[in-house]
Amino acid sequence: MKRTLNIGIVLCENFLSDQQNAVDSYTQVYEDVRMFEFGLKLFQSLPFNIQETLIFCNAEQHKIVDKAAKKYKNTTVFFSRDTDVANVYEAKVFIQEKYKLTQDYKKRGVSSYYDSCCFILIEANRPLTAIKTVKSVYEKALIEKAAIAVLPYNGTLMNGNNDVVFSHLQDKNRFNYWKQSKAYEVQYPQAYTLNKLNQFSKQQFLRARSMLDLMKISNKSPLSIVDGSAYAFRVVTNLDFEILLGILKNG
């Protein structure tokens, strides 16, 4: 019996970056859409029933993404201008509100967003990630019905300004994050994760620590646990995303 999932895909190249010139911007959007279409084809061949595919993109991507999405059934595209959505949490809320995932919606037989959704933020041109890492993290997420989110990249982290990155990890009135030091969570993600897992056993933490070590997490690629079982990490370049989807397809 196939398991039923909702798939949420966010195309977020330039999600928090400055506006590029029209030619470069269009080229990147086209590349994102090509990757997104490749992903949809592979998702459809996975051993899961895909109930709904939710695609979030920014305004400049909307027209071309919407055109591509019309080829696939049960696919909905949402978009917002950069000023409306500043980070991954707001993107999730934006989709949730637009999709109207209420109790009435559940009664119509559709799974709630957080109960069964594989939520992927596609962010092109990210550092390479080992295939073994991608496979292990995504398998764990699928088994646990977890949401997978990628923190929007901001170049200020590379220049030592961790305040911007921390703003993506902060409470937003929904989570209780460790406040000892704004830089500490980003520079030492293992310690940050331990704090987030302190309600679980040491063995469970060690498994998470092993995953972090495998992913070679550093201060340049922070990881946070978003919704308890939801992992956030940077994904990869277009080629690596295709490899990832191939792994999901072929096991």
UniProtKB/Swiss-Prot annotation:
Name the chain's protein. Answer: Uncharacterized protein MG116
Provide the species name.
Mycoplasma genitalium (strain ATCC 33530 / DSM 19775 / NCTC 10195 / G37) (Mycoplasmoides genitalium)
User: Taxonomic classification, please?
Assistant: Bacteria, Bacillati, Mycoplasmatota, Mycoplasmoidales, Mycoplasmoidaceae
